[in-house]
């Protein structure tokens, strides 16, 4: 479900602190999103805004430069200076090159998974393990 994925992505970015202490984060209306799936206002006045594109594709899919150019066009239409494109798949080298030059952050499926684990979004700890090491100082001192 694309809407669920968009909500997950926005929730992750909020959990990472992108909406700030008093900011807001919303998933845009699907029928009229103009190529932007989420908007994060990082402050109450909305002077610092991050626009988000979220695409849930098969992991073997590669997103190319044209998709990033389309997102860049959507950003330009709202006079945005920053955007994040998040996918469950990967990006081509040309997509990375274009995004870097336009100030667009790309997060692929591997990085998305790492961030979800790091910030505890959609996961829970099932079990923890103790890892022991030898305390050499203990054995060097006389009892």
PLM feature spans:
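Mixed-charge (Asp/Glu-Lys/Arg
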Residues: 1-143
């Amino acid at each position: 479900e694309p809407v669920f994925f968009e909500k997950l992505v926005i929730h992750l970015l909020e959990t990472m602190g992108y909406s700030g202490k008093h900011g807001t984060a919303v998933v845009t209306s699907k029928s009229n999103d103009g190529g932007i799936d989420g908007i994060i206002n990082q402050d109450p006045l909305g002077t610092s805004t991050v626009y988000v594109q979220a695409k849930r594709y098969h992991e073997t899919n590669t997103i190319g430069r044209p998709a990033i150019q389309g997102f860049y066009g959507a950003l330009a239409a709202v006079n945005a200076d920053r955007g994040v494109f998040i996918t469950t798949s990967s990006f081509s080298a040309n997509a990375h090159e274009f995004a870097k030059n336009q100030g667009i952050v790309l997060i692929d499926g591997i990085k998305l998974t790492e961030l979800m684990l790091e910030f505890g979004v959609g996961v829970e700890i099932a079990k923890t393990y103790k890892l022991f090491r030898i305390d050499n100082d203990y054995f060097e001192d006389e009892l």
